[in-house]
Swiss-Prot record:
GO terms for molecular function: transferase activity, transferring alkyl or aryl (other than methyl) groups. Signal peptide: none annotated. It comes from Corynebacterium glutamicum (strain ATCC 13032 / DSM 20300 / JCM 1318 / BCRC 11384 / CCUG 27702 / LMG 3730 / NBRC 12168 / NCIMB 10025 / NRRL B-2784 / 534). One of its GO terms (cellular component) is plasma membrane. It is a multi-pass membrane protein. This is Lycopene elongase/hydratase.
Length: 287
């Protein structure tokens, strides 16, 4: 049993849990202005069960291509034996359904709408016949929805409406999400082509994809600077993503695997930028 739990948690990418739990918690706190049981329920859901489902479904239906991908098998993606696939799918359902029921019951019609979109995006990204991850450009939009939707749910679940400033921040976050998905796809161009998989990066090439990623990161930084002072500090923090991706501005399809270096930096940049945002918000609150 402990081995099964270990494999399930490995598949859920613990290093990336913060990317979904933090947006929910931050949006909830900014809009509701308080921490209650619903806040903690959402945090727990988007921290672990949500990621078990999102990455678990992906690992099951991407098994054949992941076997050919040298970067899979660690923090960047588990390659679980086929004997574990049914367990992983059951875990995805069992761990999420109770949380979903409560979030639907105690949420608002608007948060329920975003929650429905979030669940559909998680399933559609990897599930057979839908496979949004193999539909160029839709793949980036869907992946970004995975990370933006928790924030939208957090911002609307208590009955308050997001302010204009929050919508701008969410727009910046959505651009960040698209840029990040494209950055991740660059390193897999050759592996995906060998497995006959399509992605935005296989269609426009590694160089085109990395440059699009840089542009989207830059737009995200510019958009957030339109918010009231001192949002420009967050804009500067986002520029670290721009510089990280821009290092590979002239990458080619033949050398696409080199982009893995930027992806490894990206995983840790999330913690740095998250810390900057947190410290900034604490400082503003104290002022």
């Amino acid at each position: 049993m402990m081995e099964k739990i270990r494999l399930i948690l490995l598949s859920s990418r613990p290093i990336s849990w913060i990317n979904t739990a933090y947006p929910f918690g931050l949006a909830y706190l900014l809009n509701a202005g308080e921490i209650d049981w619903l806040f903690w329920l959402g945090i727990v859901f988007f921290l672990i069960p949500y990621n078990i489902a999102m990455y678990g479904i992906n690992d099951v239906f991407d098994y054949e291509s992941d076997m050919r991908n040298p970067r899979k098998g660690g923090v960047e993606g588990a390659v679980l034996p086929k004997s574990s696939h049914s367990t992983l799918l059951w875990a995805s359902a069992i761990s999420t359904i109770p949380f979903l029921v409560i979030l639907f019951i105690f949420g608002t019609w608007m948060s329920s709408l975003w929650l429905t979109l979030s669940v559909l995006a998680v399933i559609a990204y990897s599930a057979p016949k839908l496979r949004f991850k193999e539909r160029p450009f839709i793949d980036a939009l869907t992946s970004s929805t995975h990370f933006t939707s928790p924030a939208l749910i957090g911002a609307t679940i208590t009955g308050t409406s997001p302010s204009a400033a929050m919508w701008i921040a969410l727009g910046s976050f959505f651009l960040w999400g698209m840029a990040s998905q494209i950055l991740g796809a660059v390193q897999d161009v050759n592996a995906d082509r060998e497995a006959n998989l399509s992605s935005i990066a296989t269609v426009i090439g590694a160089r085109g994809a990395i440059r699009l990623s840089v542009v989207l990161y830059l737009l995200a930084a510019v958009l957030v600077t339109t918010l009231p002072n001192p949002a420009w500090i967050i804009g500067i923090a986002i520029l670290t993503y721009v510089f990280n991706a821009a290092r590979f501005w002239n990458i080619t399809d033949a050398s696409c695997e080199q982009a893995n270096r930027s992806w490894k930096v990206f995983l840790w940049l999330n913690y740095f930028v998250g810390a900057v945002i947190t410290i900034l918000l604490i400082a503003i609150h104290q002022i």
